[in-house]
Amino acid sequence: MLKLVILCFALFYNTVSSTRFLFGVEVKCDFDEVFQLTVSHWEDDGNTFWDRDEDITGRMTMFARKKIFFYQDGHHGFEFGKLEPYGWFLHNCTKNGNFREYRHGLSSTSGSNGLEYIEYTMSEFLKIVRANKKSDRKLDKTYLWESYLHQFEKGKTSFIPVEAFNRNLTVNFNECVKEGVIFETVVHDYDKNCDSIQVRWFARIEKVCGYRVLAQFIGADTKFWLNILSDDMFGLANAAMSDPNMDKIVYAPPLAINEEYQNDMVNYVNNCIDGEIVGQTSLSPKFDEGKALLSKHRFKVGQRLELLNYSNSTEIRVARIQEICGRRMNVSITKKDFPESLPDADDDRQVFSSGSQYWIDEGSFFIFPVGFAAVNGYQLNAKKEYIEHTNKIAQAIKNGENPRYDSDDVTFDQLAKDPIDPMIWRKVKVGQKFELIDPLAQQFNNLHVASILKFCKTEGYLIVGMDGPDALEDSFPIHINNTFMFPVGYAEKYNLELVPPDEFKGTFRWDEYLEKESAETLPLDLFKPMPSQERLDKFKVGLRLEAADMCENQFICPATVKSVHGRLINVNFDGWDEEFDELYDVDSHDILPIGWCEAHSYVLQPPKKYNY
């Protein structure tokens, strides 16, 4: 292997080392005000092509202040050395607003043309090699976390760690990916000169931010950000297992190796392997096996299930799975299953159309197995054939028999919930009160007074509604193990707004209301147990995440924790006013670590004030 490494490195070094890496910086701002900064990365092979966008190999846009400076070390000629760092600016940070262009070296960090500079260095940000390689032009507009990741390197921002969230992948990688772990990764220095051979080297994880890791090549100073779910990250010895003859995969270090080893590759490789890899914690083959399982889903496109009508929650309709993205599914009502003319898709987001997007997690309270409505006597809007089919399923379940499903039915087993302790379940009574985040609302920033209205026949399911004259009309079925129900007094204890029943007059007090209604509270042991304090402490104000908008559930947005209220976090969508903030339980599947969208080829919406 050693000979192969040296030969490969020598071959590529002679052809690639003359490339210089340059940064062009475009600045647009008002004088002395916050500006938008776009950094474009060219590979300069000796030609000058500042105006050709097709030659840009990477671009990053951020908001900053004008006292900033970018530079990049590189190689010049056929000898290792440092290219003189410089900055190339086009800006209008002048009193008269005229554009000014200049080139400035880093011999000093003081001014040129009347401006002062601070030095700003950053690691390489690798474009994601997506686990889902499906080409999609809409992904060109997805938001990336580049600027915040580089802020993290400077200690200026932080992210909620993956282990704090409820399960959001079909495979759990929390125990695999940790600081200090060594893995194999693709070295892209050689991409242009190697069409059929993949070049890899070893790297160590320095920091973990959601599904992004900051890593450093073994034996080099180069650091880079990589998504752990990309096709560029492998367990140690993956190359030997996947390509035993090493015909298509070779090991070679990055071009920017430490200077002391540039002329002594034998010692370089030996020191890397013996001194920094042998005996260290490495990414195991289970990591690669887990990634392979990500493409295997519990459900399949075309399956049918039952979907709660979000605009009429007393009704269930038949829906089909249109797309699957990890745990999330795009489901819609189709003409194939609807007994009448389909409602207008502009008025009903659950109705199928060419651009319909109704994305929910596979654990969403909105979906039920085929036969749920029939088993529980819930209003079902479906074709006659489907109603007859599900009545047979309900009868079989009642008789203790195995139902006969169609091949495309989502079954009760596929959407099974955790069993409920019978002793605890006996404590539940119709009329018991609790506090509720209305999952059918247009705003998710308060709790409501609510009651249990009736029991479903399916174990663990209840019909609940918010107290008031429209309680039955606005009621809906929900499993007791959910992220929307909270015990009486929760809002007051954690400083949240509690909305009293409609038409309630005066100041609402729980003790007075319970006495007036001759009602009791839902016992505490019926609610989800409070997470450990250790886990809750991982949700801190200012930490960043990705969050699905519960009003427009096709949108996943960059977001920030604004406040913490027990097991509820108040999330602000970056760039949006606080009136659009939403409350999420820490167990919600609608909050995600950063990098989730990137790894699943799902568009992460840019912040509202972010100019793309």
From Swiss-Prot:
The keyword Nucleus appears for this protein: yes
Disulfide bond entries: none
Domain of life: Eukaryota
A GO cellular component entry from the record: nucleus
Manganese found in the keyword field: no
Main location: nucleus
InterPro entries: Mbt (IPR004092), PcG_chromatin_remod_factors (IPR050548)
Variant or mutagenesis effect after changing F580A: Abolishes binding to histone H3 trimethylated at 'Lys-9'; in isoform a
Chain segments annotated as transmembrane: none
Subcellular location, record wording: Nucleus; Chromosome
Consequence of gene loss (knockout): Multivulva phenotype in combination with loss of function of class A synMuv genes lin-8, lin-38, lin-56 and lin15A and with the class B synMuv gene hpl-2. Reduction of brood size and defects in the development of germ cells. Loss of function results in suppression of mat-3(ku233) mutant vulval phenotype.
GO MF annotation: an example: histone binding
UniProt MBT repeat ranges: 143-249, 263-380, 381-501, 508-607
Keywords, comma-separated and alphabetical: Chromosome, Nucleus, Repeat
Record GO biological process: negative regulation of DNA-templated transcription; vulval development
Outcome when changing G371E: In allele lin-61(n3807); abolishes binding to histone H3 trimethylated at 'Lys-9'; multivulva phenotype in combination with lin56(n2728)
Role, per record: Synthetic multivulva class B (synMuvB) protein required to repress the induction of vulval development by Ras signaling. Unlike other synMuv proteins it does not associate with the multiprotein DRM complex and the NuRD-like complex. Interaction with methylated histone H3 is essential for vulva development. It has a role in maintaining genome stability.
Quaternary structure annotation from Swiss-Prot or TrEMBL: Interacts preferentially with histone H3 that is dimethylated or trimethylated at 'Lys-9'.
PANTHER family associated with the record: LD05287P, POLYCOMB GROUP PROTEIN
Domain topic, free-text comment: The MBT repeats specifically recognize and bind histone H3 di- and tri-methylated at 'Lys-9' (H3K9me2/3).
Protein name according to UniProt: Protein lin-61
Gene name of this polypeptide: lin-61
